[in-house]
């Protein structure tokens, strides 16, 4: 009866230890599942393989005694998978951290190159626009100066032609210059004799003698 009581007591202790160990390992399994699937699978296999071994050792220990089972209790807790998972977790972010700065540097270099190319293209476009504007301004000034020079030449030619022409002094001169009256007509001769400086130089006697001669010539023609 004493052996049976000890056996039951050992079984009760082992069940409590197994329950505590399983409750402690469950959060570890869930944490490993969040970090990586492969690590969780390996830890589950290790935990499942170790629990039967613990049960086997516990089954053997009742024959030995209560002291041996007490010494075997600390062996039931599995600290090794936690260390392995922590190393996996610490190693994977470190790799990502090492790879991220290089990608950032490359992206920064590409953006800098793009900005430099855009600045160069904008500068060249500005230079081309300034050159075109300067050329158009020069062409406009050249055309303006050429028109001014041509206008001055035309005005000078008109003035020279007007100076070369003789302006008519009276209506008779204008008609004679235009060719409406012949230069040898009697009316033109009479008007020229009666007007001008010749009339002032002639005396009254000379005029009467000339008239008498003309009158005599007219009577002779009638006879």
Curated annotation (Swiss-Prot):
One Pfam family from the record: EVI2A
Signal peptide per UniProt: 1-19
Disease: Expression of this gene is altered by viral integration and this altered expression may predispose cells to myeloid disease.
Modified residues (Phosphoserine): 197, 203
Ranges in the topological domain labelled Cytoplasmic: 152-223
Keywords: Glycoprotein, Membrane, Phosphoprotein, Proto-oncogene, Signal, Transmembrane, Transmembrane helix
Membrane topology: Single-pass type I membrane protein
A single cellular component GO annotation: cilium
Extracellular topological domain residue ranges: 20-125
Location within or outside the cell: Membrane
Keyword Transmembrane helix annotated: yes
Protein function: May complex with itself or/and other proteins within the membrane, to function as part of a cell-surface receptor.
Compositionally skewed regions (Polar residues) per UniProt: 40-60, 83-102
Family of this protein: Belongs to the EVI2A family.
Domain of life: Eukaryota
Glycan-carrying positions: 28, 46, 55, 120
Protein name per Swiss-Prot or TrEMBL: Protein EVI2A
Source taxonomy: Eukaryota, Metazoa, Chordata, Craniata, Vertebrata
Stretches for region Disordered: 40-109
Residues passing through the membrane, by range: 126-151
This protein's encoding gene: Evi2a
Source species: Mus musculus (Mouse)
């Amino acid at each position: 009866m004493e052996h049976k009581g000890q056996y039951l007591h050992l079984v009760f202790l082992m069940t409590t230890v197994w329950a505590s160990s399983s409750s402690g390992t469950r959060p570890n399994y869930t944490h490993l599942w969040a970090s990586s699937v492969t690590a969780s699978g390996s830890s589950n296999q290790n935990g499942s393989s170790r629990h039967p071994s613990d049960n086997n050792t516990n089954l053997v220990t009742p024959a030995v005694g209560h002291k041996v089972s007490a010494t075997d209790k600390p062996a039931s807790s599995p600290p090794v998978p936690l260390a392995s998972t922590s190393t996996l977790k610490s190693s994977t972010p470190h790799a990502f951290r090492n790879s991220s700065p290089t990608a950032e540097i490359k992206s920064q270099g590409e953006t800098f190159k793009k900005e430099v190319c855009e600045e160069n293209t904008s500068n060249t476009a500005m230079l081309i626009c300034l050159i075109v504007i300067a050329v158009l301004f020069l062409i406009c000034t050249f055309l303006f100066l050429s028109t001014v020079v041509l206008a001055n030449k035309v005005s000078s030619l008109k003035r020279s032609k007007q100076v070369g022409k003789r302006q008519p002094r009276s209506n008779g001169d204008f008609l004679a210059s235009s060719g409406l009256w012949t230069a040898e007509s009697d009316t033109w001769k009479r008007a020229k004799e009666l007007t001008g400086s010749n009339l002032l130089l002639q005396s009254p006697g000379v005029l009467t003698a000339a008239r008498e001669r003309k009158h005599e010539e007219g009577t002779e023609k009638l006879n």
